[in-house]
Curated annotation (Swiss-Prot):
The light-harvesting complex (LHC) functions as a light receptor, it captures and delivers excitation energy to photosystems with which it is closely associated. The keyword Membrane applies. GO terms for molecular function: chlorophyll binding; metal ion binding. GO terms for biological process: photosynthesis, light harvesting. This is Chlorophyll a-b binding protein 25, chloroplastic. It is found in: Plastid, Chloroplast thylakoid membrane. The chain crosses the membrane at residues 100-120, 152-172, 220-240. Chlorophyll a 3 binds at Q137, L147, E214. Binds at least 14 chlorophylls (8 Chl-a and 6 Chl-b) and carotenoids such as lutein and neoxanthin. Chlorophyll b 4 binds at Q165, R176. InterPro entries: Chloro_AB-bd_pln, Chloroa_b-bind. The LHC complex consists of chlorophyll a-b binding proteins. It is a multi-pass membrane protein.
């Protein structure tokens, strides 16, 4: 009763009518049910250059204007959708979630590709520091030592690593989507709560700007990871070694030189 009274009083300030459920709707067959409610984020101020109809746009060479369904509501919306991939709202929501998740993985992956090699080049012993060779160490006779230290994690079974990854990532993803004992999730893409111990999302306008920075850096990281994959296939070297080779001899160590000389399988 108190909850219903609070709901009526709070909504009356917004000028909206409230339908108070009857006791039978609340209790059902003698069982109380709880539903996850989703609250809409506070609108970003019109002065932001990244949101709204007057936001920064990149329409590409084949688009005269931004399509009507791209209104600048979401971070990273530059009004460019020549192929119409965002026309269907459900497809757009799914693709947006996939992009944000892949952005986060790519940013972590790019750091994981660069930093071990950077540390190894500065005297830190990692064992195998090149990112696409490190995982294969688990099949060696001595197994895989995390950070080159057998007292941390000494892995010798690929199945055990796979099982740990499934359990740990499954638990985190389940909590991100459905909530858990540490709190209820309002937005699966930006769950906040225990996922935001520093309180970066407390200020709505600062949080909106951080979303834009995340998506921009994430898109750059996805391109970086694609480049790392291509480098690994073509040169068989890590990103920092490729960079050092290019700086030492830019004429013979560049994308054009490798593209014109590369023959798969040789």
């Amino acid at each position: 009763m108190a909850a219903a009274t609070m709901a009526i009083s709070s909504s009356s300030f917004a000028g909206k009518a409230v339908n108070v459920p009857s006791s039978s709707q609340i209790t059902g067959n003698g069982k109380a049910t709880m539903r996850k409610t989703v609250t809409k984020a506070k609108p970003v101020s019109s002065g932001s250059p990244w949101y709204g109809p007057d936001r920064v746009k990149y329409l590409g060479p084949f688009s005269g204007e931004a399509p009507s369904y791209l209104t600048g509501e979401f971070p990273g919306d530059y009004g460019w959708d020549t192929a119409g991939l965002s026309a269907d709202p459900e497809t757009f929501a799914k693709n947006r979630e996939l992009e944000v998740i892949h952005c986060r993985w790519a940013m972590l992956g790019a750091l994981g590709c660069v930093f071990p090699e950077l540390f190894a080049r500065n005297g830190v012993k990692f064992g195998e520091a090149v990112w696409f060779k490190a995982g294969s160490q688990i099949f060696s006779e001595g197994g895989l030592d995390y950070l080159g230290n057998p007292s941390l994690v000494h892995a010798q079974s690929i199945l055990a690593i796979w099982a740990c990854q499934v359990v740990l990532m499954g638990a985190v993803e389940g909590y991100r989507v459905a909530g858990g004992p540490l709190g209820e999730v309002i937005d699966p893409l930006y769950p906040g709560g225990s996922f935001d111990p520093l309180g970066l999302a407390d200020d709505p306008e600062a949080f909106a700007e951080l979303k834009v920075k995340e998506i921009k850096n994430g898109r750059l990281a996805m391109f970086s990871m694609f480049g790392f994959f291509v480098q690994a296939i073509v040169t068989g070297k890590g990103p920092l070694e490729n960079l050092a080779d290019h700086l030492a001899d830019p004429v013979n160590n560049n994308a054009w030189a490798f593209a014109t000389n590369f023959v798969p399988g040789k």
